[in-house]
Amino acid sequence: NVLVKAYQLSKGNPIEDTMDIVTSVQEQVELQGATLNILGVGTTGYAKDVLSDVLGADAAIVETVAHTESALQFYDEVDVICDVGGQDIKIMILNNRQVKDFKLNTQCSAGNGYFLQSTSQDFGIPVENYATEAFGAESMPDFGYGCAVFMQSDIVDFQRQGWKKEEIMAGLANVLPKNIWLYVSQIPNLSKLGTNFVLQGGTQHNMAAVKSQVDFIESRFRGKAETANIIVHEHCGESGAIGAGIEAIRLWENGRETTFIGLESSKEIAYQSTTSEDTRCYFCKNKCLRTFIDVKIDHPIEDKDEQFTYKMGAQEPRPVRFYSRSKEKKEFESKVPLEAGAKRLIVGNSCEKGLVEDVNDMREIKKGLDAKLDANPNFIELAAKEIFQSFQPEVISDAIPKIQMTANQKERKSLMENRNKIRIGIPRVLNMY
């Protein structure tokens, strides 16, 4: 059962957001004359690993698992889970309560909640009033579904044509399900997935977005023998968090003692973030502009050399993100000094090598990555070799005798001789030829 819950739009810093949420939850409980006793904590979402390390959480699970756990906890019949969050869209397709397939948008922000939120703010309307404004429109422009960049351009064009802000907002809500089902998941025939749809994620607080999704899904069942059963998760904004909590409960029931730092400590986390050229990573060609978050917390976190997972072998699930200067490596000095007693958290890196500052530590990470590459085949590399593999067809006749050749035969011979001098390239984009 969900006793209390807290939800807010992200302010851009997961640590600050978490401190606000924890304070809100505690206040709700204490207003009822009760006291919280935390037996387990789970995290999920993009900042799950960061928050897990800072809070001492017991579980950090991926969003697809968290949302599936949450839906199955509240509803017996689930065929499709559609999570529309602030940054992405996730579709989980189930069979007998087991996930058999899922779709994610990892490259484009089309149709996500933040796009609707930012558009609403550009019009000077709080996102909480989005649906009220959109439902007040008597007509709406027809947006083409697809890339968010093109949709932003469409907004400008429609404004020039005289469309009102509420009409544009209605049009954006109306195109949302097309982005979900036709652009991201590319599943036009929804009826083949099943009949029970659960809508989750913070965007489902926007009733204009919900209505457009319901209308679209129902339209895909017209003329079919079955009808769609569409449910908005009763805790849609917190559905992922509930799934993470379910995993924490499971660990507690199996005898796991929580490592959570405590409510008071979590509200008093002191940190300082730095983003500058001094934090830029040069360990690969990406040259990521990283952010260093120096955190002061009371609960113990071992020094990096004792907890640096890539030194323990290639089977570790992920590298620990907290970094502190090794006592044995006093010769290394960071460009951004680390205050005594603080632990450094490095974010904004696109690969594992950017988790550290010292080149020697980076080499240790690379050893672990190389070990993984040696232990597992690189299918992208194999495909690149196979697609350009020389093809030798069977010989079906004897060679052409050396006699007087016609013009066509001479041309063919010339082409055959020049074949080894010709290179043909096939473009590759996102590992697809």
Where are the predicted features?
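Gly/Thr-rich phosphate-binding beta-strand-loop-beta motif of the actin/hexokinase/Hsp70
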Residues: 1-3, 78-98, 139, 276, ...
